[in-house]
Amino acid sequence: VNLTAAEKTQVTNLWGKVNVKELGGEALSRLLVVYPWTRRFFEHFGDLSTAEAVLHNAKVLAHGEKVLTSFGEGLKHLDNLKGTFADLSELHCDKLHVDPENFRLLGNVLVIVLARHFGKEFTPDVQAAYEKVVAGVANALAHKYH
């Protein structure tokens, strides 16, 4: 990801305030509600039949935390996202057969969740930096597919 020093600072400063458990669960839940076809990858998580069921599904919330924990690790290696996410890219491509477009969708949802939680602090400049980061992470996760 090609970020300026100021953008890197904005991203890491805001990320230091993120409650990974709360926002991870919200981001993955929103993905599954807004894009219901993504639920097929999580059928083993139990009841995902309604938005309410998804929003209160403990396995969805726990996996959302896991996803954002990995995302946070990626933020420590912004200059090597492909290397950082190589194993996850391979897993999602070869074993889970996840459509790589879903990574982009989740990134978009994450930006919305960050904006909702941080309000005025999530300025247009911060949003622009995060848009670059989520695009870079989605690209890194899709790397094995190419």
UniProtKB/Swiss-Prot annotation:
A GO term for molecular function: organic acid binding
Signal peptide: none
Segments forming domain Globin: 2-146
Modified residues (Phosphothreonine): T12
GO cellular component, one term: hemoglobin complex
InterPro entries (UniProt xref): Globin (IPR000971), Globin-like_sf (IPR009050), Globin/Proto (IPR012292), Hemoglobin_b (IPR002337), Hemoglobin_oxygen_transport (IPR050056)
Positions annotated to bind heme b: H63, H92
Residues the record lists as N-acetylvaline modifications: V1
Residues with PTM N6-acetyllysine: K59, K82, K144
Tissue-wise expression: Red blood cells.
UniProt superkingdom: Eukaryota
Keywords carried by this UniProt record: Acetylation, Heme, Iron, Metal-binding, Oxygen transport, Phosphoprotein, S-nitrosylation, Transport
Residues modified as S-nitrosocysteine: C93
One biological process term in Gene Ontology: hydrogen peroxide catabolic process
PANTHER family (UniProt xref): HEMOGLOBIN FAMILY MEMBER (PTHR11442), HEMOGLOBIN SUBUNIT BETA (PTHR11442:SF42)
Family per similarity comment: Belongs to the globin family.
Function: Involved in oxygen transport from the lung to the various peripheral tissues.
Assembly description: Heterotetramer of two alpha chains and two beta chains.
Name listed for the protein in its UniProt record: Hemoglobin subunit beta
Organism: Loxodonta africana
Encoding gene per record: HBB
